Amino acid sequence: MSSMTPQEIVSELDRHIVGQSGAKRAVAIALRNRWRRQQVDPALRQEITPKNILMIGPTGVGKTEIARRLARLADAPFIKVEATKFTEVGYVGKDVDSIVRDLVEVAVKQTREADVKKVRARAEDAAEDRILDVLIPTARTGEQPADSTARQVFRKKLREGQLDDKEIEIDVADARPQLEIMGPQGMEEMAEQLRGMFSQMGHERRKARKLRIAEALKLLTDEEAGKLVNEEEVKTRALQNAEQNGIVFIDEIDKVATRQEAGGSDVSRQGVQRDLLPLVEGTTVSTKYGMVKTDHILFITSGAFHLAKPSDLIPELQGRFPIRVELESLSVGDFEAILTQTHASLVKQYQALLATEGVTLEFVPEGITRLAHIAFEVNERTENIGARRLSTVMERLLDEVSFDAAKLSGQTVRVDAAYVDGRLASLSQNEDLSRYIL
């Protein structure tokens, strides 16, 4: 669980996302409250439920990017899902309970990786011993002491990488092919249980394999680490981590909102909302690792709400998202900042890509300003897709350089206002062309 302060979280988000201070503050406070709750007396802790968040804003302004970055900062089980993938039970689509099952899988993976990291040094020592037993067979027969001079010499060579290319034959667990069982829609849990049941049938088989020592060492280290990790303890802690610290981000929630004026039958849109409701307000979901309570899982939802309004969601679901954050559309200045100030901006990405072929890409401020203006104008005249427009415009701008990069090796390409206008101005001014090309 991350112990970063709200200011630190916002500062980290600022490195990747321009503007949207309201949304950043909301998720930062929500994440910090997860940590605060863990410090509270256990009797009161159970009564403190998370304040779920609804983010509203047009496409391409940073809603999904905030979720992606939050996942890396949270240091807690985190899953992002699309609301459109789920349908009411009885229709074609995924069962909403699979959200919790997937969250638990993430928690188990995180917990196991953390435990493997702790025992890594012991596992590496055990793997080295197994390789040395193959290299110096006499050590196994008792003719020489286990820590003989020869063994120490070989251990030193092994650690220095001098033996990496030597081939040896070792016994390793035979990884049998995974039995794939295709369950019907909404029956993913049953299919998972059947897979687990079949995988446990029969004894573990071992097989002799001839491998380079470098590969054998990695394989044996993973095998030894698996023996040192207590799987039952991993499952118990992972379930608790998912229940107490889990975060679920549901994107495109507006797509399951039913518009009041819409006629005809909406394919179970309200049904999806009603199925999500118990999950958000607190229920118990059965997973292959055990029962999971969702009372303290934090839910963050987002949607553009172009056609529907937040008030079109069923009232019970609206009430479960007390924190509403509206994200603003991006301005020309925001586009410029995205191109120049973010940690891994498109400008830096293209410069790094073309540098691999010896081409130096130099962006001057006037060129970036003109590029931002063109992206903004195209968004205004056609569909507003926010910052995603910059990717389309940049790809078109550097199409020629990217194609001829091998011929331009050793040269510097200067991207100024004239360069941008020469390649994009005619396209951006022609609405038909910009609609289909930019």
UniProtKB/Swiss-Prot annotation:
Keyword list, A-Z: ATP-binding, Chaperone, Cytoplasm, Nucleotide-binding, Stress response
Q: Name one Pfam family in it.
A: AAA_2
UniProt: ATP binding residues:
18, 60-65, 251, 316, 388
Q: Which Gene3D superfamilies match?
A: 1.10.8.60, DNA helicase RuvA subunit, C-terminal domain, P-loop containing nucleotide triphosphate hydrolases
Its function, per the record, reads: ATPase subunit of a proteasome-like degradation complex; this subunit has chaperone activity. The binding of ATP and its subsequent hydrolysis by HslU are essential for unfolding of protein substrates subsequently hydrolyzed by HslV. HslU recognizes the N-terminal part of its protein substrates and unfolds these before they are guided to HslV for hydrolysis.
Subunit comment: A double ring-shaped homohexamer of HslV is capped on each side by a ring-shaped HslU homohexamer. The assembly of the HslU/HslV complex is dependent on binding of ATP.
In its UniProt entry, what is this protein called?
Answer: ATP-dependent protease ATPase subunit HslU
Q: Which organism is it from?
A: Paracidovorax citrulli (strain AAC00-1) (Acidovorax citrulli)
Source lineage: Bacteria, Pseudomonadati, Pseudomonadota, Betaproteobacteria, Burkholderiales
Task: Name the gene for this chain.
Answer: hslU
